Amino acid sequence: MAHILLVEDSPEVSMTVREILASVGHTVAEAPQGREALKLLAAGKFDLIVTDIWMPGMDGIALLKEIRGSGNSIPVVVISGGAPNAPLTYTAPLAATFGADKVIYKPFEKDELLRAITDVLSD
């Protein structure tokens, strides 16, 4: 199974995602925002990143820019409730522009998250 870096500022969402991923055998390391995620990414080997977009501190877009700017091609699944004061349709193109492999929206179903992860890991 995969070793996944989860970047999410909401403890509730983080716990939900962690439990879903662990239920199918994935291991999960967690960071509450982008700066901490970059430190974990530099210190360890991950198969995939699952990140929120809109977080305090370094958000998911800035994280994607840093990751892709460094030449790292690790798969990234974005989970987002949408941009503050922007329609949900704004998030997917923005995330894709900066290198996200897949975008899913909160609230999401367990199967939707697992399908997105399976899709990007099999590419």
What kind of region is each of these model predictions?
Residues 8:
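Conserved acidic carboxylate
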Residues 11-29:
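Two-component/phosphorelay signaling modules centered on CheY-like receiver
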Residues 30-39, 60:
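Helix N-cap/capping motif at the beta->alpha junctions
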Residues 44-50:
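Active-site beta3 strand of CheY-like receiver
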Residues 52, 80:
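Active-site residues of response regulator receiver
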Residues 55:
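Receiver (REC) domain active-site loop signature in two-component systems and cognate sites
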Residues 61-73:
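Short amphipathic alpha-helix used as the core "switch/output" element in two-component signaling
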Residues 62, 83-104, 115:
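Alpha4 helix (beta4-alpha4-beta5 surface) of REC/receiver domains from two-component response regulators
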